[in-house]
Amino acid sequence: MTRAFNFSAGPATLPESVLRQAQAEMLDWHGSGASIVEMSHRGAEFMSVAAEAEADLRRLLDIPEDYAVLFLSGGATTQQALIPLNFAAPGQRADYVVSGHWGKTAVKQAGVYVDVNIAASSEANGYRELPARADWQLSPDAAYVHLTANETIHGVEFRDVPDTGNVPLIADFSSSIASEPLDVRRYGVIYAGAQKNLGPVGIAVMIIRLDLLERSGQPRADIFDYRSHVARDSMLNTPPTWNWYLAGLVFKWMLAEGGVAEFAKRNAAKAALVYGAIDGSGGFYRNEVAHAARSRMNIPFFLPDAELDARFVAEAKAAGLLALKGHKVVGGIRASLYNAMPLAGAEALVAFMADFQQRHG
């Protein structure tokens, strides 16, 4: 069987070796006579899987001991609602930097619980660049500052960590976590849905500085309280064990491949290929994002008209290049180049782009 190159923004492509290992272990995990999906989350077998996954993630991202790591059901949008509940008092101000669709979603979720101050936004220019740091209007008494590290739809990415002083910085890293070295200590909280760089859909990773858990936050049930999840090692309720197991396999794969430093090199090479093809097309393909803000993970681009966009997607699919249709918010084309996308995938896309332009340009 020949696998296609899957450029989906999420759920995204997974390493073939991980999928094959999961396939081989599906019926009989490590000689136990049972599948991992059948095992109790509190049994010794799965507890070992969970402990290894946390240890491997800590090693992969160099997470300090004074940060808790959680594996929780759901995705990043759920955490966007839980973050103000846990880290801000009722009605307290929280600063939000909006650089795209998901930053705007975070504002909507938080607005139910806190006084949201949109400290900066690039919406006026269509999210084609990052909000200029000099224009940020931060609140000295804010509970936290929130930003989205990489916007999958608009294709913009923060590469430098902004200094927020004594106010904790909270960041949604769903689409760029583990794609390059990350200084965890610059953040109060890092959160990410797993389905782009860390594993399958259905599980989220939280990295929380322990002192922030001392905040009383707002009245909430235990299931919405990060302190309760930390106290129970992410097993306050039955976790998505299969997703956790698969994420653990992805962590091991990344470590074996050389860790985040190696993936930073690979991701830079893939992005350079695709942006090079766009910029060298004489305008047939165009990316509208300011060069300094361009995402390495998600590259949106457009052809001269919508009819050509649709033809590009259809012909690419026939050529074994999947899920290149842009998000409905912006249209066009989008190529997602997460860690599990090999260089050969970017090369195949660039070759197809050249051929398509020759035939339709």
Swiss-Prot record:
Its EC number is 2.6.1.52. GO terms for cellular component: cytoplasm. It is found in: Cytoplasm. One of its GO terms (biological process) is pyridoxine biosynthetic process. Pyridoxal 5'-phosphate binds at A76, T77, W102, T152, D172, Q195, N237, T238. It is an enzyme of class 2 (transferase). The modification N6-(pyridoxal phosphate)lysine is found at K196. Its main location: cytoplasm. L-glutamate binds at R42. It catalyses: O-phospho-L-serine + 2-oxoglutarate = 3-phosphooxypyruvate + L-glutamate; 4-(phosphooxy)-L-threonine + 2-oxoglutarate = (R)-3-hydroxy-2-oxo-4-phosphooxybutanoate + L-glutamate. Keywords: Amino-acid biosynthesis, Aminotransferase, Cytoplasm, Pyridoxal phosphate, Pyridoxine biosynthesis, Serine biosynthesis, Transferase. InterPro entries: Aminotrans_V_dom, Aminotrans_V_PyrdxlP_BS, Pser_aminoTfrase, PyrdxlP-dep_Trfase, PyrdxlP-dep_Trfase_major, PyrdxlP-dep_Trfase_small. Binds 1 pyridoxal phosphate per subunit. Its cofactor is pyridoxal 5'-phosphate. One of its GO terms (molecular function) is O-phospho-L-serine:2-oxoglutarate aminotransferase activity. Pathway: Amino-acid biosynthesis; L-serine biosynthesis; L-serine from 3-phospho-D-glycerate: step 2/3; Cofactor biosynthesis; pyridoxine 5'-phosphate biosynthesis; pyridoxine 5'-phosphate from D-erythrose 4-phosphate: step 3/5. Homodimer. Catalyzes the reversible conversion of 3-phosphohydroxypyruvate to phosphoserine and of 3-hydroxy-2-oxo-4-phosphonooxybutanoate to phosphohydroxythreonine. NCBIfam families: PRK05355.1, serC_1. Belongs to the class-V pyridoxal-phosphate-dependent aminotransferase family. SerC subfamily. This is Phosphoserine aminotransferase. The lineage of its organism: Bacteria, Pseudomonadati, Pseudomonadota, Gammaproteobacteria, Lysobacterales. The gene is serC.
